[in-house]
């Protein structure tokens, strides 16, 4: 029986997509981001829970009144959810049959041009209302330094989503000294503005809320001395990216 490997769930999240959302955090990720706040999700073979589609749908549907009242739904995050597309295809299809908005939060670290990946993703996309795409860095060498992997396939995936006219929000973690260079942010903005499907751009300020997990796992945390960016740095980053010529009104 097809099962999903989960790390955890959050019943009423408010930051990973519109409205109130039930969030599934999947187990497994190919990236090794220096600032990852969930390093315990990296190994796909070590889930805290295995679930069937029916089990998950039965847990989610009691929250539908909250989704309907707030314009919310279900977001699958990670880890990297695209590592478990056969499970997500079935889950999202069932959720859509029940009138639930579906959202995928991905870094696309496992995206590739194989027929198998393309076939599964095209099926999943049929049942996906929104994708939150995390672009860690626009510069390939700096992306490797930050995540351990190149970004060429990730940018190609972003272009494919644009060709598919899939609604997307793009997010970028602002890490002082690593992903806050003015020229890089300008290039990031030029790339994002070249896509036709991006509805929203968000900067996520770096934080150290997950450092204790690195210590628990016995992994050295390289960014121990990096402080969170201040409000002015965040505002400057929005200006450099210049998404559709505007910055969020709350700034």
Swiss-Prot record:
Domain Radical SAM core intervals: 15-244
PROSITE patterns (alphabetical): RADICAL_ACTIVATING (PS01087), RADICAL_SAM (PS51918)
Entry function: Activation of pyruvate formate-lyase under anaerobic conditions by generation of an organic free radical, using S-adenosylmethionine and reduced flavodoxin as cosubstrates to produce 5'-deoxy-adenosine.
Root EC class: oxidoreductase
CDD domains: Radical_SAM
Family to which this protein belongs: Belongs to the organic radical-activating enzymes family.
Catalysed reactions, semicolon-separated: glycyl-[formate C-acetyltransferase] + reduced [flavodoxin] + S-adenosyl-L-methionine = glycin-2-yl radical-[formate C-acetyltransferase] + semiquinone [flavodoxin] + 5'-deoxyadenosine + L-methionine + H(+)
Record GO terms (molecular function): 4 iron, 4 sulfur cluster binding; [formate-C-acetyltransferase]-activating enzyme activity; metal ion binding
UniProt: [4Fe-4S] cluster binding residues: 29, 33, 36
Main location: cytoplasm
Protein name: Pyruvate formate-lyase-activating enzyme
E.C. number(s) listed in UniProt: 1.97.1.4
Pfam family membership, one: Radical_SAM
Subcellular location as annotated: Cytoplasm
UniProt keyword annotations, A-Z: 4Fe-4S, Carbohydrate metabolism, Cytoplasm, Glucose metabolism, Iron, Iron-sulfur, Metal-binding, Oxidoreductase, S-adenosyl-L-methionine
InterPro entries according to UniProt: Aldolase_TIM, BssD/PflA/YjjW, Organic_radical-activating, Organic_radical_activase, PFL1_activating, Pyruvate_for-lyase_activase, Radical_activat_CS, rSAM
Taxonomic lineage of the native organism: Bacteria, Bacillati, Bacillota, Bacilli, Bacillales
Protein's organism: Staphylococcus aureus (strain NCTC 8325 / PS 47)
One of the GO BP terms on file: glucose metabolic process
Free-text comment on the cofactor: Binds 1 [4Fe-4S] cluster. The cluster is coordinated with 3 cysteines and an exchangeable S-adenosyl-L-methionine.
Cofactor(s), names only, from the UniProt record: [4Fe-4S] cluster
Binding site for S-adenosyl-L-methionine: 35-37, 79, 134-136, 207
GO annotations of cellular component type: cytoplasm
